[in-house]
């Protein structure tokens, strides 16, 4: 996983190795590839205490619905969910720094609850805010990003937008991992980036935006840092026939197109809805 930054800093203090890029990168220039994706801005992205995220709406969301913030399951303030664990409707008062198009913080949003979170099959957290989309737009002039309900395709030009670092990473979808295994967790049908997206610690939870549509197609979550095989911070790809592939320096995201089917009226989570395949508690 692209470790939450606080954990990465703690590891660095103890060991002096392993997570230095998460610290050093604050002064590093943005990747040159980002120059090709200027149309994708920071508007609607958020910074968490340890990760990145975004204010998102579903295709059927209405302006008076409570807004949602999406990040990774491993970015929860309560720690990493165990394999098989699903968090639903858990109270939360977490705060998020809302960014405008240029990456400046324009306000603070607050959660009322964790609507859904897991690290099983996918790595996602969805917070329900105390504000509606209309209230956010009225107060800050910021609209949410829209989650696509269509599966992305290989070759798609994408931008990973980190609200924590206020940096973007532009590349393409290289392909998909049938299973991506990291430590005790396994994720399905993960997005593999081309090598240009060198995401770092703190970019966890960043929205992955389809440059052509402007819609969110995935949430950034991990990468193989050291060439390890299926260990923490060193995920491996497992093919349908069981073949294991390690791609050192390659980073990954989890697809989000299945999320809209699990929410109904008023942005209310309903895991029993037809077409909803997210893991259940």
Question: What are the functions of these language-model segments?
Answer:
Residues 48-50, 64-66, 70, 91, ...:
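Extracytoplasmic
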Residues 244-281:
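PDZ/PDZ-like groove recognition
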Residues 144-171:
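Short glycine/Trp-rich loop-beta-loop segment that forms part of the substrate-binding cleft
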Residues 1-28:
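Secretory targeting and sorting signals
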Residues 60-67, 210-215:
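A glycine-centered beta-loop-beta connector
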């Amino acid at each position: 996983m692209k470790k939450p930054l606080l954990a990465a800093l703690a590891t660095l203090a103890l060991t002096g190795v392993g997570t230095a890029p998460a610290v050093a990168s604050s002064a590093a220039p943005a990747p040159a590839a980002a120059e090709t994706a200027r149309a994708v801005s920071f508007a609607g992205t958020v910074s968490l205490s340890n990760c990145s995220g975004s204010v998102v709406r579903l295709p059927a969301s209405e302006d008076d619905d409570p807004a949602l913030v999406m990040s990774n399951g491993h970015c929860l303030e309560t720690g990493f969910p165990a394999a098989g664990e699903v968090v639903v409707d858990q109270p939360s008062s977490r705060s998020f720094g809302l960014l405008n198009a240029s990456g400046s913080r324009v306000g603070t949003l607050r959660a009322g609850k964790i609507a859904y979170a897991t690290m099983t099959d996918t790595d996602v957290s969805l917070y329900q805010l105390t504000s509606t989309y209309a209230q956010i737009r009225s107060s800050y002039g910021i609209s949410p990003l829209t989650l696509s309900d269509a599966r992305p395709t290989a070759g798609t030009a994408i931008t990973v937008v980190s609200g924590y670092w206020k940096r973007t990473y532009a590349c393409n979808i290289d392909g998909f991992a049938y299973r991506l295994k990291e430590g005790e967790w396994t994720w399905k049908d993960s997005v593999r980036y081309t090598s240009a997206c060198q995401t770092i610690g703190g970019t966890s939870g960043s929205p992955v935006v389809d440059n052509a549509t402007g819609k969110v197609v995935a949430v950034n979550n991990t990468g193989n840092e050291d060439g390890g095989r299926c260990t923490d911070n060193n995920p491996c790809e497992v093919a349908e026939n069981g073949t294991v592939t390690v791609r050192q320096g390659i980073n990954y995201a989890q697809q989000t197109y299945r999320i809209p089917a699990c929410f109904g009226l008023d942005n209310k989570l309903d895991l029993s809805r037809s077409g909803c395949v997210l893991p259940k508690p």
